[in-house]
Amino acid sequence: MSHLTDEARAPYRDAQSSIELGDNSLEAIVAANPARRTVLKNGLLGLSILPMLGALAACGDDDDSSSPTPTPTPTPTPTDSYAINFASVAANQNDTVTVPSGYTVDVLLKAGDSIEAGTPYSGSYPTPADAEKWAGGNHDGMEFFELSGTDANSGGLLAINFEYPDFNILMAGSYNAATATASQKALALSAVGIGVVEIAKGTDGKWAVKAGSRFNKRYTGNSSYKASGPASGLLSPTIKGMLNNCASGRTPWGTYLTCEESTDNYLDPTQPEENYGWVVEIDPYQELAVPTKRTALGRFDHENTAYMANSDHRVAIYMGHDGTPGCIYKFVCDRAYSASNRAANIDMLDHGTLYVARFNADGTGEWRAMVHGQNGLTVGASDPGNTSQSTTPLAPTPVDFNNQAEVLVNCISAARVAGGTVMDRPEWITVAPDNSAIFVTLTNNSGRRVTNPANPRVTNLHGHIIKFKEDGNSPLAMKFSWEIFLQAGDPKLAPGGANLVGDIKGDTFSSPDGIRIDPKGRLWVQTDHSVPGNSGVTGTTIDQAFGHNAMFHIDQTTKQSKRFLVGPLGCEITGLAYTPDLKTFFVNIQHPTGNWPVAGQQPRSSTIVVRRTDAQPVGN
């Protein structure tokens, strides 16, 4: 989540009556064994393909006085290596994107660039009609999709989330939803949602958007969407817009899942709240259904999705509630998907069971079904409140769940009632390619007052990463084992307290947010600490402690951290996609505040392309 959206939503949240979040945050666990750590075996530890060089030995006949001329050995083509060999870059506060020596960075798509045919940003404020065709603002999650008949390492589709407007290129002054005109609302809403662009690599190795492609399309806060699934009857028949599109994911059948990280429309509060806070399924190829809000996956502040599938094509979708605190969920489809018929999967996400994770003190966990009539989800239920952020016991709040639709619409409360564990702001989730591990970033929770094994720090300013393993590596499992993978922080912050130090080996960071395991099993983490931010030590800002937000590789065995990329002034690093050969990485730079990406112009959120200059895989 961008700190900008936190600020934008604050007045709206403050005006609402609130229920303190869940007593089931592991407070019952803390007495059991607060120092617990479980060591899980990892089946994807530093996978690499090493270069193989061969040599032929020429054998001559000892009785032959003349040695035959050996046949020349062709120079072997080096095998691509995916070992992590880049030289770590230093933490810094430069107003540029810093990458290791031997790498290059190009800007692919800036806020205000054209997606659909029209006039791009040129320094003047646009009309809503103009901005509807532009790339929106605050680029966030994204996915790369292959195109039939196109070499996927040289071209394809990129679907990109736009979380929040880059208001500096839209209008003069600040935006106030309470007093905004219809035109101002339309302008603000034009800059959120997603964009799909066809991209291609040129002969010079640089990537560009293919202008005029039939795939280039905007889906905005002004567009129309439908709802489907068990709670669709509680939503409007036609929904205006989606917004706060934070991170994202994909399905095995090639659709894009974009996540609404807000349960209200804070840019236009006249819209019904129930219409927002959903996972929206969009087909980037424009072959299947219209963009659809899938209510079976629950309504909360969604961050991203990540799927696990087995050999029988059964699939689970993992999700985190970006709240302080929030729960971790999975949705299990009730049938196998079709790998040969995309159209047969059109309603896969409407039928299945939503579960919430419960973390036990002994290193085990279980999935609690969020089904009406089960786990306390009935009329006369009791929401336990959140003693994790209060040392004073809270009175439970009565809540009624009359049917499954109400369970899904009121998912945040239902998860606590069902016994889900509330965590320190679960953001991105990633699943190992062989299903052997799942990682979740818990970005931070400065409000935590009671510790426990899964959330072990009071005033958790810097966050941590948790790892769990499904029984049998199965998406259908009802139990799992877990461990804390690492705690963010830095030893030089020890004067502010032990909870600021962390246990990172190598390059330190704060507030892990984006996380992704690439197809070769390499774990990448992106950070989102607020700027200037509180490091926990008086007189030291968070940028002074850690440098600008950055992207890291973390070895899953040694847990050694290496800083790969550092962003420009004021930005968050978010979003990661790549070509199949991993020679091109796409990364988003969100809300820069300095003089980037174009000197002398307004700062703009942008998608960048990171490549090696020798055309080898990124990371080597």
Regions found by a protein language model. Give the residues of each.
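N-terminal secretory signal peptides
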Residues: 1-38, 49-52
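Conserved small-residue
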Residues: 20-33, 42-45, 71-620
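N-terminal twin-arginine translocation
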Residues: 32-38, 49-72
